[in-house]
């Protein structure tokens, strides 16, 4: 795709200050450092990570991912490392593809493995659903791939200055026309249902809409691109855990001459007219810069911008659903008896559309899922070195994620609800065949909407603004801040949106707003 002109900050910038050492901040820093910029990251936590961090078990007995567990498009990590002449080998980062990407279990007792290899997946669909559905799977895969290929360069991995950018040239117009012809602005659930008949496969190829904060029945067809990433491009996992990604990116930045200040919270921005001149810390220290990238959650970012000339958008935001997550360990002698032996297992409840309505209901109308679909993640199966020692034998790491309504949809008293809901979920898994999980799963960390709200995340969700049409593409919160000359946003609240790949891209797009590089 030909490079198009984009607006950049108003003046050249050699010194760039980045607030936040998560994926977007580190991605931006590496791309900027690769152009010779003097880059400083300021991070309030004691280590890099953000939404890709880690918890420590009791006494430091293990480390388990505290955020994202699904990695797709690892080439974006390579791209960021390459910006400063580094690579995975240099940083000690080892990434392995999962096979299967997911193991799907259904309420009727059947299972379907999800493979990125087309032949392997076709064989699995034929086994589980019959020959006719295997043929239809190939048609669906082609449609998902066409959707991804049509939108990626122009609509995902590019900066927008205006909705007019969607059709501001003959090539852009052609891409938009093709996106419309593919059904990109109809509903994802409807488009998938046109191509495959088995309700289990429909779930496998549409549940990813929840990553974008939308039920499959209401998500736009363009979000078939997420399903393509998940089911065709492959799911991966780094040795040692997802947090190894941010550790590797941070190490590459330091080696390239960048700097990171940990345990340092930015609480203000100084300005002269419309130019931000320095970030100020909670201790009162000044960190001057020529340009600033803010990667925090939107409420925190807007609080920083509130005392500057920045024009903060006032329109109401619709927030994504949240999550309730249990982290801990369980004896391998228990898990070894389970039928499911996969890194990621999606254990689908019988209900489907009704559970999404519970999760995404309007203000005050939401509830927890009455028949939950759950993500069970067992990283030790892929990275055995992560195993924890137990008094009676080795214990594997285990995370159980239940989608949950956000605090706007359902202002639940999670402090009181957490113990009973934890017991309810473990009881559900016990009945579904995960024998011993109620008794033997030592839960060391519980995350709920209360957790995310305490960290400054709006509506108590780590998934930020939902990808409804008014919050998608050029209609999403713009990364170039109006009213000030030299501030750019990055992270899941701005373009292109939520997810590990898109957050990495947002960092690169923020860097481009400073350098003007394509």
What residue ranges belong to the model's regions?
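A conserved FAD-binding loop/helix module that cradles the flavin
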Residues: 68, 492-515
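FAD-dependent oxidoreductase catalytic-site/capping-region signature
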Residues: 375-467
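Helical element adjacent to the flavin cofactor pocket in flavoenzyme catalytic cores
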Residues: 225-276
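Mid-domain catalytic core of redox enzymes
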Residues: 267-390
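N-terminal glycine-rich phosphate/pyrophosphate-binding loop and immediately adjacent elements
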Residues: 10-153
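Rossmann-like flavin
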Residues: 107-218
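A glycine-rich dinucleotide-binding beta-alpha-beta segment and adjacent secondary-structure elements
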Residues: 198-212, 369-375, 435-496
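Extreme N-terminal leader/targeting segments of oxidoreductases
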Residues: 1-16, 34-35, 468-472
């Amino acid at each position: 795709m030909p490079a198009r002109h984009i607006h950049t900050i108003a003046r050249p910038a050699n010194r760039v200050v980045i607030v936040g050492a998560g994926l977007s901040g580190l991605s931006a820093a590496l791309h900027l450092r690769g152009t010779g910029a003097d880059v400083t990251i300021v991070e309030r936590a004691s280590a890099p990570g953000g939404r890709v961090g880690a918890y420590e078990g009791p006494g430091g007995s293990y480390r388990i991912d505290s955020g994202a567990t699904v990695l797709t498009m690892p080439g974006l990590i390579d791209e960021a490392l390459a910006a400063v002449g580094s690579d995975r080998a240099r940083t000690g980062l080892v990434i392995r593809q999962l096979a299967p990407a997911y193991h799907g279990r259904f309420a009727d007792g059947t299972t379907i493995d999800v493979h990125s290899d087309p032949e392997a997946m076709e064989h699995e669909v034929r086994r589980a659903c019959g020959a006719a559905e295997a043929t239809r799977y190939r048609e669906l895969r082609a449609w998902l791939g066409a959707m991804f290929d049509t939108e990626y360069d122009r609509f995902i991995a590019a900066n927008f200055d205006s909705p007019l950018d969607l059709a501001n040239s003959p090539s852009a117009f052609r891409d938009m026309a093709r996106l419309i012809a593919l059904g990109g602005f109809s509903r994802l659930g409807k488009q998938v249902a046109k191509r495959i008949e088995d309700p289990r496969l429909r779930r496998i190829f549409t549940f990813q809409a929840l990553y974008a904060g939308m039920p499959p029945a209401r998500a736009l067809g363009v979000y078939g691109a997420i399903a393509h990433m998940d089911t065709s491009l492959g799911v991966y996992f780094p040795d040692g855990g997802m947090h190894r990604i941010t550790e590797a990116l941070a190490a590459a930045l330091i080696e390239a001459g960048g700097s990171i200040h940990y345990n340092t919270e930015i609480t203000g921005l100084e300005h002269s007219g419309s130019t931000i001149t320095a970030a100020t810390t909670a201790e009162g220290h000044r960190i001057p810069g020529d340009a600033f990238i803010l990667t925090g959650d939107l409420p925190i970012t807007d609080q920083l911008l509130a005392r500057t000339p920045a024009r903060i958008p006032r329109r109401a935001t619709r927030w994504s659903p949240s999550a309730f997550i249990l982290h801990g360990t369980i004896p391998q002698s228990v898990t070894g008896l389970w039928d499911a032996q996969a890194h990621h297992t999606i254990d689908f409840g019988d209900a489907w559309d009704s559970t999404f309505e519970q999760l995404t209901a309007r203000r005050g109308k939401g509830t927890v899922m009455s028949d939950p679909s759950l993500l069970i993640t067992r990283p030790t199966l892929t990275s055995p070195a992560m195993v924890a020692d137990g008094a009676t034998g080795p214990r594997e790491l285990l995370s159980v994620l239940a989608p949950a309504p956000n605090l706007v949809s359902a202002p639940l008293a999670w402090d009181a609800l957490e113990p009973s809901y934890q017991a309810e979920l473990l009881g559900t898994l016990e009945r579904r065949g995960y024998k011993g999980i109620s008794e033997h799963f030592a839960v060391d960390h519980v995350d709920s909407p209360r957790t995310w709200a305490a960290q400054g995340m709006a509506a108590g969700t780590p998934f930020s603004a939902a990808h409804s049409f008014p919050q998608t593409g050029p209609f999403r919160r713009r990364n170039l801040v109006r009213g000030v000359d030299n501030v750019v946003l990055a992270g899941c609240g701005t373009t292109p949106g939520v997810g590990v790949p898109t957050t990495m891209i947002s960092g690169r797009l923020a860097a481009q707003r400073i350098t003007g590089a394509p």
